[in-house]
Amino acid sequence: MTNYACSITNNIPVKIYTDGACSHNPGPGGWGVYLSYKNHEKKVYGSNINTTNNRMELTATIEALRLLKHSYKVELYTDSQYVQMGITKWIKKWIKNNWETSNKQLVCNVDLWQLLYTLIQKHQVSWHWVRGHSGNIGNEIADKLATNGKIEAMKIAKNNENTKKFLD
């Protein structure tokens, strides 16, 4: 793994593109991260056999920030308005209200939002929303990675289902 060591004062930002994908929502899903810094690239993806698209979008963002071992200036690009609005508009109010919505309900995916909030404290993050499937190269790479994760999750879920049928 490449070490992306640099100071947060460095003017060259780490560029991160994230995406999540889910089949049947909830169902098998995947997340993808495309990271570039100077002349280095990193592509990572993962999966979950029972999840939602929003959880995969958040997981992609969390896993991307976990890749950074030091404090960075980060430009983070997502095609998820849920992530974009949540982190730039809603999260401060959620924290003030003890992670409850205005209806006194616990924020959906609170576990992931809390983790994401903790991770961003280490970095200087600029959040950018990009339209999905609009030709943005970084987003297209992240989308393909998320789809790979989703396909793996679908295969695992199918094998588990077949195993259950076999054992019954």
From Swiss-Prot:
Keywords, alphabetical: Cytoplasm, Endonuclease, Hydrolase, Magnesium, Metal-binding, Nuclease
How the cofactor binds, per note?
Answer: Binds 1 Mg(2+) ion per subunit. May bind a second metal ion at a regulatory site, or after substrate binding.
Query: Could you tell me which residue ranges the RNase H type-1 domain spans?
Result: 10-151
> Which EC number(s) does the record attach to this protein?
3.1.26.4
Positions with a binding annotation for Mg(2+) 2: D19, D143
Entry similarity comment: Belongs to the RNase H family.
Q: What is this protein called?
A: Ribonuclease H
Q: What organism is listed for this UniProt entry?
A: Orientia tsutsugamushi (strain Boryong)
Q: Could you tell me the gene encoding this protein?
A: rnhA
